[in-house]
Amino acid sequence: GDCHKFLGWCRGEPDPCCEHLSCSRKHGWCVWDWTV
């Protein structure tokens, strides 16, 4: 499963799927900092 620039599944930070985005542990996907 490929990781998308946003809404990509992640398990926590740091996560390579998120690249420069942050991993929202609440929702379990990569998000912009202002949405965490």
Swiss-Prot record:
Its main location: secreted. One of its GO terms (cellular component) is extracellular region. InterPro entries: Huwentoxin-1. Disulfide bonds join 3-18, 10-23, 17-30. It comes from Avicularia sp. Allosteric modulator of voltage-gated calcium channels. Moderately inhibits human Cav3.1/CACNA1G (IC(50)=5.06 uM) and Cav3.3/CACNA1I (IC(50)=4.32 uM), and weakly inhibits Cav2.2/CACNA1H (IC(50)>25 uM). Acts by making a crucial interaction with a Leu residue in the extracellular S3-S4 loop of domain 1. One of its GO terms (molecular function) is ion channel inhibitor activity. Expressed by the venom gland. Belongs to the neurotoxin 10 (Hwtx-1) family. Pfam families: Toxin_12. The modification Valine amide is found at residue 36. It is found in: Secreted. The presence of a 'disulfide through disulfide knot' structurally defines this protein as a knottin. Keywords: Amidation, Calcium channel impairing toxin, Disulfide bond, Ion channel impairing toxin, Secreted, Toxin, Voltage-gated calcium channel impairing toxin. This is Omega-theraphotoxin-Avsp1a.
